[in-house]
From Swiss-Prot:
Gene3D superfamilies: Na+/H+ antiporter like domain
Family statement: Belongs to the NhaA Na(+)/H(+) (TC 2.A.33) antiporter family.
Entry function: Na(+)/H(+) antiporter that extrudes sodium in exchange for external protons.
GO molecular function, a single term: sodium:proton antiporter activity
A Gene Ontology biological process term: regulation of pH
Identification of the protein by name: Na(+)/H(+) antiporter NhaA
Entry-linked InterPro entries: Na/H_antiporter_dom_sf, NhaA
Organism annotation: Rhodopirellula baltica (strain DSM 10527 / NCIMB 13988 / SH1)
Bilayer topology term: Multi-pass membrane protein
PANTHER family: NA(+)_H(+) ANTIPORTER NHAA (PTHR30341:SF0), SODIUM ION/PROTON ANTIPORTER NHAA-RELATED (PTHR30341)
Reactions catalysed according to its record: Na(+)(in) + 2 H(+)(out) = Na(+)(out) + 2 H(+)(in)
Compartments reported by the entry: Cell inner membrane
Membrane-spanning ranges: 25-45, 76-96, 112-132, 141-161, 170-190, 194-214, 225-245, 312-332, 345-365, 378-398, 414-434
NCBIfam families: NhaA
Length: 440
């Protein structure tokens, strides 16, 4: 006779609540990296085939939305880069808030190394780019080689498997999140040409309304969505890139649940008699109890965790691939590869990123304000730092801001080539420096 052993679930510890979102995040980013590669290949093939004109014309299809006297008339490409990407930036805001509240950036001593590494990984590439483009028209692209694409980095680490120490994954993820913060500041400060104070004031009022709704305990999402859309419109008209409203709202999202698990268990204990056969047999009563339990179950999850779990797959598998299809299509020509802008972007990503990360990491460790995490040594850290040169999503996004809506083909070529070299170099060096797998 088969013996089936039933085990009671162990109580959830605080560390589990912090690590489960992190593990889920890594899994989604690893698989979405493969989807991004596929979409990039499709975009490149389309842009270099006989369908190139149709491919470009499709993304420039005009869309018109009219609400009363307000008329929005933009291309599909603009809607993706300014509209859909606002959701992507909202999820970035949620990720940053999570790391600041519970993750690797919540402890300043632990966060010092990734923060310093990220700062070095932004300053050195931008400096190299500026030194190569000083006095030339391409100088405004200085922000392109500063960012790191988390999805591709995690995908590369996933290919290397269990040999990669957990501490390297955490360091690179934390570094990439700080990179995102830097890229957001670059977009807000470096690529805002003019400001309309009236619309900026309206955007601030809308953000204040979101804070007010949160303070008075509004838990339904539709009011926040409506006010968020109004804030997006106001910021769009103010001259600041509208996607930044996503980051602001993400950072404002509460990171703590309304109902702690202990109180939820007490509630279930109090309601235990409701589940007795006599009471449970009444249909209306049953539906009411189930609805109440469902509502309270939702209250045990913070709005931040709920929104991140809900939206992260959509950004990873829909928004970012669509963005790649709309932006990665570039005509592959020898002239693009030899252009000074493309070369500056490649040097910034392939040389500037690892050099800046290694230099600033060495500096803070030398000063004694940080130390290498367990499982890491200098060869592994320096090898992994090459993966941070995979710019892609944010780099292409900044390219569009620096050189117009469609971006500059030479800059896009530099992003694609530099990211590919960084991925190959990083994975190759890690294969060489990581401990060899033990044979069973």
């Amino acid at each position: 006779m088969n013996h089936i052993e039933t085990r009671l679930p162990l109580p959830i510890q605080p560390i589990d609540r912090w690590l489960r979102p992190f593990a889920r995040f890594l899994h989604i980013e690893a698989t979405s990296g493969l989807v991004l590669i596929l979409c990039t290949v499709v975009a490149l093939v389309a842009a270099n085939s006989s369908w190139a004109d149709s491919y470009l014309a499709f993304w420039h299809t005009d869309l018109t939305i009219a609400v009363g006297d307000i008329v929005f008339h933009h291309s599909l490409h603009h809607v993706i880069n300014d509209g859909l990407m606002a959701v992507f930036f909202f999820v970035i805001g949620l990720e940053v808030k999570r790391e600041l509240a519970h993750g690797s950036l919540s402890d300043l001593k632990q966060a010092t190394l990734p923060i310093a590494a990220a700062i070095g990984g932004m300053i050195v590439p931008a400096t190299l780019y500026l030194s190569m483009q000083y006095g030339q028209p391409g100088v405004q692209g200085w922000g392109i080689p500063m960012a790191t694409d988390i999805a591709f980095v995690v995908g590369c680490l996933a290919i290397l498997g269990s040999r990669v120490p957990h501490s390297l994954r955490v360091l690179l993820l934390s570094l990439a999140i700080v990179d995102d913060i830097g890229a957001i500041l670059v977009i807000a400060i470096g690529y805002t040409e003019s400001l309309d104070g009236r619309y900026l004031f309206l955007a601030a009022v809308a953000v204040g309304a979101v804070h007010f709704l949160s303070r008075i305990g509004v838990r339904r999402f539709p009011p926040y969505v409506i006010v968020g859309v109004l804030a997006w419109i106001a910021l769009h008209e103010s001259g600041i890139h509208a996607t930044l409203i996503g980051v602001i709202l993400g950072l404002m999202t509460p990171a703590t649940p309304t109902l702690v698990p202990e109180r939820f268990r007490e509630y279930l204990h109090e309601k235990e008699h409701e589940f007795q056969p006599k009471e449970w047999s009444r249909r209306l009563h049953r539906a009411e109890v189930v609805r109440e339990v469902q509502q309270l179950t939702r209250e045990t999850v913070s709005p931040l965790e709920y929104l991140e779990v809900t939206l992260h797959p959509w950004t990873a598998y829909v928004i970012m691939p669509v963005f790649a299809l709309a932006n990665a299509g570039v005509l592959i020509e020898p002239a693009n590869l030899s252009d000074s802008v493309a070369i500056a972007v490649v040097i910034g990503l392939v040389v500037g990123k690892p050099l800046g990360i290694a230099l600033f990491s060495w500096l803070v460790i030398r000063l004694g304000v940080a130390r290498l995490p367990s499982g890491l040594n200098w060869p592994i850290l320096m090898s992994g730092s090459f993966l941070a040169g995979i710019g892609f999503t944010m780099a292409l996004f900044i390219d569009g801001l620096a050189f117009g809506a469609d971006g500059l083909d030479t800059a896009k070529t530099g992003v694609l080539v530099g990211s590919a070299i960084s991925a190959i170099a990083g994975m190759g060096l890690l294969l060489w420096t990581l401990p060899k797998p033990t044979r069973q």
